Regions:
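Short loop/turn segments that flank or connect secondary-structure elements
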Residues: 19-202
Length: 202
């Protein structure tokens, strides 16, 4: 007894449409390090490679509706940030100039068992306007890539990279200052390009 076999057509002449973003995503998984990307050397090199593309992307983002962009960036950040360990990276602590207010200085000086005067002498620079910043880059409190005063870290450190703050497209310059050194920023920006279907013009 013979059994009829129905052939399966793998290719047809019918028109079909493919979302190019899917292929971009699959290509990224195949060629890039494990996603999300946390290899700092790779990120630095890739940032140099994508410099021209990122100039165009910034111009593209400035034309977007600010509220819609904020929602998308926040959503991507909420997905990506938990997958990247800031406490095992510490790269931002090697490059950020951190502002400090009086309450933060008082709290940390007390934690360290120092008078405010001694704390200020050791760790703070003050401008003519009274603005206070940490006087060392890398930060004094970075020890083996981890913050030694993590529970007492400053607001600027807690909020970085500030994807939850409104008006993202007005902070592109400062965001891109750290694109080549912060895995969260790098991954959010690159995923944002895919979500928006952005392609560099030639």
């Amino acid at each position: 007894m013979s059994t009829a076999v129905t052939p399966i057509l793998l290719f047809t002449n019918w028109p079909f449409y493919v979302d190019k973003r899917l292929f971009a995503y699959l290509y990224r998984i195949k060629t890039d390090p494990k996603y999300p990307i946390v290899d700092l050397e790779y990120i630095k090199n890739k940032a140099n490679e994508l410099a021209s593309e990122n100039d165009q992307f910034q111009a593209y983002l400035r034309e977007m509706d600010s509220n819609q962009l904020d929602k998308l960036v926040y959503s991507l950040s909420e997905d990506i940030s938990p997958k990247i360990s800031c406490t095992s990276c510490g790269n931002c602590c090697k490059s950020l100039m951190v502002n400090i207010d009086e309450d933060e200085a008082n709290r940390l000086s007390e934690h360290l068992g120092k008078t405010r005067a001694d704390f200020d002498d050791a760790y703070i620079s003050k401008g003519e306007s009274g603005r206070m910043v940490i006087n060392s880059i890398p930060c004094h409190f970075l020890v083996e890539n981890s913050c030694s005063v993590y529970e007492y870290r400053f607001a600027g450190c807690r909020e970085f990279p500030a994807f939850h703050v409104p008006d993202f497209n007005k902070r592109l310059f400062t965001t891109y200052m750290h694109y080549d050194r912060c895995p969260i920023i790098f991954n959010v920006i690159e995923t944002l390009k895919e979500e928006l279907g952005f392609e560099k013009s030639k």
